[in-house]
């Protein structure tokens, strides 16, 4: 292994040992400022402790080959970390409580760059002070690629060199010294201190040589083969002429130029070329022209690509527009916001133009706009525009924390509509027609009434600005065709609605027809409101079912909540002739509107029609005057419809109710003791009525007739006897009792009379609620004719 060449830089002029610091943090900034500005050394902290800090040189030559073995079989040593021996130590004095500096080693294994303060100096002093005699030159030969110096170079090369602040150069050994073997060179490198003292004791005349001879020797040795492309050192780039008269030495060549200045020069060339752009085909372009590839040029390319698209958003990037004013003058923008980025890329190929190519005038740039765009370029343009618009909308509107969510939708609607209106002159008629078609389909989905005049006004949505006559006529023809299609759809919907009404009217029973005489006809499907359509769907969800009493759901009456047809059959049976002297006139006090019972078989239990409606009933007529019981309007018509109703309708498995006129009226007398006759018994329940009787139907209540049920009791008018109220009339006419279904089935009477406990409990409770005293609870009527004895026959549904 060969020895490394070391370079020593003197730090005596800085007087580091005399510096004292109170704080630990002040040491590194001070060292970096002084060493970098005067010596060109950049230091970093290698180790740090509470009482010491070790600074080392920040070597730029990391991971480079240093030495290589003579034998090819041995491994090559590669520097992975900084191996420069330069070190400065900072020690903390506990007694004095200050930090002091000490130089551990001022040697380097690499060439130290020229300090910043010496770059601009043009004069080099001729006089060399005595203190700088021990300072060695920094321009030393580097090892070659193999790390072994040739024998011809060893004789003429010093082992340790340095430079002083005054740039005085000194030789350690004589030029005509004999050849030094490699062993002696190794010994000299191991003892740099002895050589430095020897150099200080030598005389001035024998040690100082001319700069010309030094630079001629160092130029052949200081630049090895692997050291290519780097900036030469400060002494190599200077060729100093020494006058024979001993005058001051002046440099004959310019100072060394760093890479940063070289980049600046190349940038100036590229900027000059940008003023006169030339169209170059990508096929004819030379692939070897890569001399102007630079990061700054790439940055300008990106800015030039983004600047034409930045005008889509107002005030988005004013700085980029100001930085590139030439782009707007050289490349005029079209009327649209769509700029081809591929054309801009072709324009940017001017950066790779060779110097020998003649420049063309600026008028040739207009040929770029006449190039036809293929599908790839069009897609690229659309993607660029969409990306800019999406990012802008997302950042300015959607992701803006200052805008509420309620206003974001309005802003998006306004933005899209303004874009369409601004560029509608360049949109195709098919696109506008599709927009209008979608608009009309949307309105038909909401089932709003759309007239032809309104359609005409809506068709002018995009016609606010003048258009070409051809496009306008084409749009009118399409709109007329659209209106014809829409009228045909409306006619079809109306015909379907009429056919549906006819089918429903034919399938209805006479009882159902009576319920729908006063109802309106079915609204056409197109003019229906959402509520009407919802109710129609609820009524017609079963096949063959129609709204009304006949359209009930078979399992439970709870699912039939049609308020329009509620108790229509009850009202039809109750209304009779309007003349006061009609002996057959039926009254409302004989039945009441039970709230919540919708078309159930319990209806006939609570309705008490006149006995004359059924001549075979044999019931006792009531003694109340007919003038207090009659209603006004439509009695004759409803009575005729009532007589046409059949006794039972078995088509729906016992769901329809029997006519109310066939139900016998219970006797009403002044005697509270009720003795039922076999002729006045209620008809037997319908077949298979157990599953249809749901007790939850009694819990449903409506407020339509609840306030009138307790006011139509005529038996309470001008009756001197407090016990004149019939037991059953009180039960079925008093809203406070009938609203509680549990009252009918709870036995609260005398347990000794088990056969009449149900009826007696009802009578007792009713008389107590009305404030009367009824004590006749020991009636000995026919127990087999009790009203509620047949109640268990309705099945387990109760």
Curated annotation (Swiss-Prot):
It is found in: Nucleus. Pfam families: AFT. Disruption phenotype: Leads to hypersensitivity to oxidative stress. Residues 193-223, 476-517, 657-695, 705-718, 774-789 have a biased composition (Low complexity). InterPro entries: AFT. This is Iron-regulated transcriptional activator AFT2. It comes from Candida albicans (strain SC5314 / ATCC MYA-2876) (Yeast). Residues 256-274 have a biased composition (Basic residues). Keywords: Cell adhesion, Iron, Nucleus, Transcription, Transcription regulation, Virulence. The keyword Transcription regulation applies. One of its GO terms (biological process) is cellular response to starvation.
